[in-house]
Curated annotation (Swiss-Prot):
Protein known as: Urease accessory protein UreD
Subunit structure: UreD, UreF and UreG form a complex that acts as a GTP-hydrolysis-dependent molecular chaperone, activating the urease apoprotein by helping to assemble the nickel containing metallocenter of UreC. The UreE protein probably delivers the nickel.
Record family assignment: Belongs to the UreD family.
Subcellular location: Cytoplasm
InterPro entries according to UniProt: UreD
Length: 277
């Protein structure tokens, strides 16, 4: 056996594997979870319908932590006209590791006229974690998206800095007839100068958006005392937030969502019940 084959087999054998596939379908004016398949410790609770047609789903990872060699895959498919809101009851925690990289891969496919709200808790990378995060959203014509991603490097609430380890994060949003967003962030332990020394980074994306939506968002951001900015890339609104306080950052994201949901989706805010616990 070649060395490369032994290394590949070693990384494949290490850690847990989990895969969750969800398909949302619209019928009779209501979105249903039409199909679900899961392998390993990644699953969902029963759907909630606090506002009628949209389907609210909580994604669960019972172990609570991700360690060396773990491979988690999330595959979400929305059929035409469907509307799903997905969130999580807790943060995704990437623990310290001296072994293979822990990997989280997320794929979201939005067919024509569908709507996705992806509002997860933060991903926390403990000092010494070796992690890869790869998220890709593919939107067909008429699809609508509200999605955020929060990266917490170290545990600032406990005074722990991300002094060791490595993070490789990719985020792609593919729009019809538009370049969309394709970015990559790589941080090795202690290199928080890329973030101006801030341990918390959030990206909030909304599509489709226009200059009037951008103006509403910038008005809210002007009230903040932490670094923030927003820009339009064609019809894609991209918001960046830096912070030292996770609770403050989560509160800011929720405030933005309360502004963007009616502006982009034409719906009043209906917060997931888990946010109140």
């Amino acid at each position: 056996m070649l060395l490369a084959e032994r290394v590949e087999q070693s990384e494949h054998d290490a850690g847990w594997s989990a895969h969750l596939q969800l398909r949302f379908v619209e019928g009779g004016g209501v979105t249903r979870l039409g199909a679900r398949r899961h392998f390993g410790p990644l699953l969902v609770q029963r759907p909630f319908y606090p506002e009628g047609a949209p389907c609210h789903v909580y994604v669960l990872h019972p172990p609570g932590g991700i360690v060396a060699g773990d491979r988690l895959e999330l595959d979400i498919h929305l059929e035409p006209g469907s509307h799903a809101l997905l969130t999580m009851p807790g943060a995704s925690k990437f623990y310290r590791s001296i072994g293979p990289t822990a990997r989280l891969t997320q794929r979201f496919h939005l067919q024509a006229g569908s709507t996705l709200e992806w509002l997860p808790q933060d991903s926390i990378f403990f000092s010494g974690a070796r992690a890869s995060l790869d998220s890709r959203f593919t939107l067909e014509p008429g699809a609508r998206l509200l999605a955020w991603e929060t990266l917490c490097l170290g545990r600032p609430v406990m005074g722990e800095r991300f002094d060791q380890g490595a993070l490789d994060s990719r985020l792609s949003i593919e729009l019809p007839d538009d370049p969309g967003l394709h970015e990559r962030l790589r941080i090795s332990g202690g290199q928080l100068e890329k973030l101006g020394g801030h341990p918390l980074l959030a990206t909030f994306c909304a599509s489709p958006a226009d200059p009037s939506v951008l103006e509403k968002v910038r008005h809210l951001l002007d009230e903040l005392k932490t670094p923030a900015g927003a820009t339009l890339l064609g019809s894609l609104l991209v918001i960046r937030l830096l912070d030292h306080d996770n609770q403050h950052l989560q509160h800011t994201l929720q405030r933005l969502w309360h502004v963007l949901r009616p502006a982009v989706l034409g719906l009043p805010a209906c917060p997931p019940r888990i946010w109140a616990t």
